[in-house]
Amino acid sequence: MAGHSKWANIKHRKERQDAKRGKIFTKWIRELTVAARQGGGDPGSNPRLRLALDKALGANMSRDIIDRAVARGAGATEADNVEELTYEGYGPGGVAVMVECMTDNRNRTAAAVRHAFSKCGGNLGTDGSVAYLFERKGQISFAPGVDEDALTEAALEADADDVVSHEDGSIDVFTSFTSFYAVRNALEAAGFKGDDAEIVMQPTTSAELDLEGAEKVLKLIDMLEDLDDVQNVYSNADIPEDVAAQLG
C-alpha cells in the first residue's frame, strides 16, 4: 500500500536492535540447535538448517560456534531441552501480535510475555486467538538496484506468490511456506540471490495506527524483543509513513 510503511519498519528496527544487543548470536544458536534436532545435521537435506546456517554466517558467527550448535542439536553432544512456543495476543489499538519463542522453561517465558502485554496495555490471548489473521510465508528480499522486470519474471516462473516493490527500490518476493526453498533455489539458479530470506508470519489484515497508538505498540514490541527467549515478533500494525516520520 503506497504511503504506508506497514511491517517493514518494525522488522528493520528489530534487526538493528538485535545486533546492538548482541542477542542475534543467541537467537541463531538456538535456531541451529533446534533445526538440527528436527531435521538432522546435514544442511544439504535439511532446508531449515541451511537457512539458519546462512543467517548465522551472515551475522559473522564463527564456524566453530555454528558447528557446536549443530552437533548439539544433532545429538553428537548433550542438547539443552529447548522447545518452540508461540504466544498470541492483542496490543494497543487492537493490533494482533504473535510472539515466537524458544525456551527451556515455558513457565518463565509465559510469565514474561504476559507481563509485557499487561504492562503495555495489551492482552495475552489463547492459542488461535490471532493466528487466523496471519499466514506463514516465505519472504526473499532484494536491495535496491536489482532488475525488477527480470526478477519478477524469474519469480513468477519459479511459482512465487507475489512480488512487491517498494518506494526505495527494494523488492520482496513472497512464496507459500511449502515452496519457499524451491523458489529461493530457482531464483539463485537464475542469478538472483536475495539479501535476506526467511519464513515470516504475514498478516492478512492490518490495523492502522495514529502516533499515540504506534508509540504504544512499538513499546510493546520492544519489550517483547528484549526477552531472552523471544525469537521473532510479528504484528499487523500499519504505520503510515507520516506517522513513522514522527517516531523517535
Swiss-Prot record:
Location(s) in or outside the cell: Cytoplasm
Q: Which UniProt keywords apply?
A: Cytoplasm, DNA-binding, Transcription, Transcription regulation
List the transmembrane segments. none
Q: Give the Gene Ontology MF terms in alphabetical order.
A: DNA binding
Pfam family name, one: Transcrip_reg
Q: List the disulfide bonds.
A: none
The record, for InterPro entries, names:
Integrase-like_N (IPR017856), TACO1_YebC-like_2nd/3rd_dom (IPR048300), TACO1_YebC_N (IPR049083), Transcrip_reg_TACO1-like (IPR002876), Transcrip_reg_TACO1-like_dom3 (IPR026564), YebC-like (IPR029072)
One term under GO cellular component = cytosol
| UniProt GO BP | regulation of DNA-templated transcription
Q: Which family does it belong to?
A: Belongs to the TACO1 family.
Q: Which PANTHER family does the protein's record reference? A: TRANSCRIPTIONAL REGULATORY PROTEIN YEBC-RELATED, TRANSLATIONAL ACTIVATOR OF CYTOCHROME C OXIDASE 1
> Which HAMAP family does the UniProt entry name for this protein?
Transcrip_reg_TACO1
Q: What is this protein called?
A: Probable transcriptional regulatory protein Pfl01_4410
* Organism of origin: Pseudomonas fluorescens (strain Pf0-1)
